[in-house]
A protein has these predicted regions:
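Intrinsically disordered, low-complexity charged/polar segments
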Residues: 121-145
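Beta-strand signatures of extracellular beta-sandwich domains
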Residues: 74-76
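Negatively charged, low-complexity tracts enriched in Asp/Glu with abundant Ser/Thr
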Residues: 1-60, 136-153
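Short amphipathic beta-strand and strand-loop transition segments with alternating hydrophobic
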Residues: 60-67
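Alpha-helix boundary/N-cap detector
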Residues: 4, 99, 103, 107, ...
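A short, exposed loop/beta-hairpin motif centered on an aromatic-Gly-Thr core
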Residues: 78-114
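Short arginine-rich
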Residues: 109-126
Length: 153
């Protein structure tokens, strides 16, 4: 998986703008310049694409991706299941920039797969056998997504 670690330049931007960097529009502009992308005043990239990676029963997994002017891909995940979920939109504060679309999608599929692996093991008052079964199938579909079958021809 090819990617660029943006931790250092993003930390430098935060340091430059002080403790309240997250409120500084100039900090967002500096991060936009790093990515060469257009974001709203909160740093969320404008015009990102949402791609459904897998759907089983009440479980859903999506990637949210955008290619910036630098040719990098920002990617985040969104997933939900019968009694919870998590997600975010791609922003200028993403620490990992992918060099191609396929790697971005594979990374997000892997990230969400690990969440569904944990959900499949839950034994709390909210989970049911159906939830665990659906989560296990989601894990399997997402693992297949990130490791596509190679063909000989």
């Amino acid at each position: 998986m090819q990617s660029v670690d943006l931790t250092e330049p993003l930390e430098a931007i935060k340091l430059k703008h002080g403790d309240r960097w997250y409120l500084a529009e100039d900090a967002v502009h500096d991060a936009e310049a790093l990515w060469q992308g257009k974001a709203n005043r909160h740093g969320v990239f404008m015009g990102y694409e949402t791609i459904t990676l897998a759907k089983v029963g009440s479980c859903n997994a999506e990637a949210r991706i955008i290619q910036t002017g630098k040719g990098w891909w920002a990617a985040t995940s969104s997933y939900d299941y019968g009694y919870g979920g998590a997600g975010s939109a791609p922003s200028v504060w993403e620490r990992q920039a992918f060099l191609n679309r396929e790697d971005a999608l594979a990374a997000i599929a892997e990230e969400i797969a690990s969440s569904f692996a944990a959900i499949a093991q839950e034994r709390n008052g909210c989970s049911s056998e159906k939830h665990r079964s659906d989560a296990k199938r989601m894990f399997e579909e997402l693992r297949a997504y990130k490791t596509p079958q190679l063909t000989l021809f």
